[in-house]
Amino acid sequence: MEMFTAIFLGDTFVVKDSFNFLPQSLEKLVSTLVRKKNANHRVLFKNLYKFFKTQNPPDEKAFDILLCKQYYPYEYMDSWEKFQSGLPPREKFFNKLKDIHLTEEEYSHVENVFKTFNMKTMRDLHNFYVQCDVALLADTFENFREMSMRIYGLDPW
């Protein structure tokens, strides 16, 4: 029997552990959707597109950037003052959990994000990172739910 982690908040709101349904990283789930043949990415990723078009309508290049893995300097962001600073150097993106640094190519992607979306501060990058992550997660769940209902006639949520 499979076990699912769920938190019940009253009678109408339930938070379920999505990893039980989709046991892959968000990066892998998104790349699977991106590779769908004949797929319109603005339809597959409608939450992502809807959110970012209200701020600054993304052209194709900018929208492709949204579909890539994003990077965040978790350990570096240890004070409110750092939200007011500009983009930190590459070594500040060190990941203690995985014991790895960003590659030059990965940092170049961060610089490209900063430039493409007219960011000035780490607050801008932080908000972009969180909003992009949540929108991609929502789109991934919605695609999984639609597929489950279409193929199996079951709503996983």
Model-derived segments and spans:
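Metal-dependent nucleotidyl/phosphoryl-transfer cores and adjacent nucleic-acid-binding surfaces
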Residues: M1-W157
